[in-house]
């Protein structure tokens, strides 16, 4: 029994570190501001933020920053944000130069896609990457019917919840005339839509 308690005593700190350390604390607005200034000093056209706990409020702070006016590529990977963060990006006048938007591994649903697909500020997008979110056929359909994403050339919807109708809408879209590449693997697409 003493040996088991001893092992548990040794393993407990590591277990706590694993469980509690898996999500870093949310970044404050001040931390985000300093971080993006540092990143944009290297290249003021590309901002990549990987595995930082931004949350919706952090993304809203980011979107409101005038320093983003020169950014053409924005990559927010595992930022722990959802539809409200996407709304802030879509409404930001600081992102009208954006041509490439990567929002991989977040909590974006069809509502977030709706914000993107209706945004005049994101009308220059050529690449949209929504890999591993919670987007369904409805979200794919919103992109397919978008009047503002007409410049889109590449779309990544890998690892979402698209079953079929969204695939058909995307492949038959009359609005996405420049779209050359659609990535849809690892979606539960039904056989009837795979031929689209």
Predicted ranges, named:
Residues 39-46, 66-73, 93-100, 120-127, ...:
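Leucine-rich repeat
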Residues 158, 162-196:
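Leucine-rich solenoid repeat scaffolds
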Residues 1-32:
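Bacterial Sec-dependent N-terminal signal peptides
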Residues 26-29, 33-90, 104:
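LRR N-terminal entry segment and analogous cap-like coil->beta motifs
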Residues 52, 79, 103-106, 130-133, ...:
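Consensus "Asn ladder" position of solenoid repeat domains
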Residues 104-105, 109-147:
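Eukaryotic tandem repeat interaction scaffolds
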């Amino acid at each position: 029994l003493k040996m088991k308690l001893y092992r548990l005593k040794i393993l407990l700190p590591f277990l706590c570190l694993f469980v509690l350390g898996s999500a870093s604390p949310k970044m404050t607005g001040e931390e985000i501001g300093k971080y993006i200034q540092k990143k944009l000093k290297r290249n003021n056209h590309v901002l990549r933020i990987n595995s930082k706990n931004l949350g919706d409020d952090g993304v809203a702070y980011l979107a409101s920053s005038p320093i983003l006016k020169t950014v053409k590529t924005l990559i927010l990977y595992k930022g722990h944000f959802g539809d409200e963060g996407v709304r802030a990006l879509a409404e930001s006048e600081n992102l009208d130069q954006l041509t490439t938007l990567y929002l991989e591994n977040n909590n974006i649903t069809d509502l977030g896609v709706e914000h993107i697909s209706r945004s005049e500020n994101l009308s220059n997008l050529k690449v949209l990457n929504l890999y591993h979110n919670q987007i369904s056929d409805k979200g794919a359909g919103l992109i397919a019917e978008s009047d503002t994403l007409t410049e889109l050339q590449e779309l990544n919807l890998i690892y979402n919840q698209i079953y079929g109708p969204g695939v058909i809408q995307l492949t038959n879209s009359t609005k996405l005339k420049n779209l050359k590449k659609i990535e849809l693997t690892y979606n539960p697409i039904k056989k009837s839509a795979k031929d689209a």
